[in-house]
């Protein structure tokens, strides 16, 4: 029974991560078409590729920094409003999805900890390592 639950949760994680990647790809594809430049040609491209981890002001600052490479002027009202609307629309989809992914991940962790009979101290050690691993991946 636990195996079936873990298999179901793993399948849900895969589906939610697929949805997340589709939204990110869709937004970045729209952005390329709107600004007339490839994300790879802008700096810092990693901040644009992980736009969902930043607020709109940070996103807009990166776009403005690359103004000379763009077909639109992000300082003008109309392009800025369009950028903000699209950014917020994407974040509106990604925010709840990322939260569901986090909660599902936490549930899987809790089930595994229980399955292996880990103590609070052991869980703390595992979570500390997990946290460090996530920090390393985000560099």
Each predicted region: which residue ranges?
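S-adenosyl-L-methionine
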Residues: 1-139
């Amino acid at each position: 029974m636990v195996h079936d639950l873990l298999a179901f949760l793993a399948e849900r994680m895969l589906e939610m991560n697929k949805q997340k990647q589709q939204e990110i790809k869709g937004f970045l594809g729209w952005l390329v078409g709107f600004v007339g430049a490839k994300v790879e040609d802008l700096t810092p491209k990693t901040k644009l590729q992980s736009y969902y981890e930043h607020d709109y002001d940070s996103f807009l600052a990166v776009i403005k920094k690359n103004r000379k490479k763009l077909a639109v002027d992000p300082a003008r009202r109309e392009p800025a409003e369009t950028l903000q609307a699209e950014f917020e629309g994407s974040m509106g989809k990604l925010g709840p999805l990322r939260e569901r992914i986090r909660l599902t991940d936490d549930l899987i962790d809790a089930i595994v900890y229980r399955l292996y009979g880990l103590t609070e101290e052991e869980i703390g050690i595992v979570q500390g390592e997990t946290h460090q691993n996530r920090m390393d991946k985000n560099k």
